[in-house]
Amino acid sequence: MKKKLIIGTRSSPLALWQADFTQAELSKHFPDLEIELKLVKTTGDVLLDSPLSKIGDMGLFTKDIEKHLISGEIDLAVHSLKDVPTETPEGLMLSAFTEREDTRDVIISKNGESLKTLKQDAKIATSSLRRTSQLLSMRPDFQMGDIRGNLNTRFKKFDESDFDAMMLAYAGVHRLNFGDRISEILPHEVMLPAVGQGALGIETRVDDEATKEIVSVMNNVNTEFCTKAERALLRHLQGGCQIPIGSYASLKNGNLHLLAYVGSVDGKRTIRNEITKENCTLPEQAEQAGIELAEELLKQGANEILAEIRKTC
């Protein structure tokens, strides 16, 4: 058994919440284990002047931490799973998937308006093409804009801006105690979340058996199966830049149900589909469900939509 673990994390308030949560959970199971946090500044934390859609988001918030993991400076990295590319660097692996927070997106509006009651041509802040596409498919009158930065910064910028509303993930808003700012929680029928949204992914070195055994106490099998299905779908579709794909999997009584959305950025072309995999007892079966649904989306024309978007990446 190791006597000390070093956790690598970004320094944003939400990332620190996630690292502190991981540290506390591990300490419950291993009270004699010394745990240290190492803060790492990532490319995504530095490049705040450009929208994510312009600079891409493949590993922007993970690569720099992974370098420390590969070199042995840290023993594990704690990520928001939605930020983790579907292909991990050689020698690294996701060793635990934590119990998932509510995966839905929320609307934060200046005067408590909902999606339906926001005024004509309302100005909406989001850095996500996925949210932009789904919103415009329902409300093509919306004027979309971008706010970057950590959650605290985004709230400050929003309050000082002329935006009417802002879209965020419930998980981060709840974890940092901004829940009283929520105007509406959007159901999956309206807005599908990002792949892995609401879950933490704990990354280790493949050959570090001691650390893998320690972090295994945090693995939630339901989260593992569901997010592996979502990530397999994304891996089968994605080309290397931020694209409007939403997905959500649920596992009940051994049956995995997977929903997916692909749309053009302007929301004029959209595809939604779903699949159920019965008796899903292995993670490989969950991943196969993701691949099968991705194939169905491609047959429905998702490849044409994604090809157009990739031209601008």
Curated annotation (Swiss-Prot):
Protein name (record): Porphobilinogen deaminase
Gene3D superfamilies: Periplasmic binding protein-like II, Porphobilinogen deaminase, C-terminal domain
Summary of the function given for this chain in its UniProt record: Tetrapolymerization of the monopyrrole PBG into the hydroxymethylbilane pre-uroporphyrinogen in several discrete steps.
Cystine pairs: none
One function term, GO molecular function aspect: hydroxymethylbilane synthase activity
Domain of life assignment: Bacteria
Native source organism of the sequence: Chlorobium phaeobacteroides (strain BS1)
Record-listed E.C. numbers: 2.5.1.61
Cofactor: record remark: Binds 1 dipyrromethane group covalently.
Assembly description: Monomer.
More details: The porphobilinogen subunits are added to the dipyrromethane group.
Pfam family, one: Porphobil_deamC
PROSITE patterns xref list: PORPHOBILINOGEN_DEAM
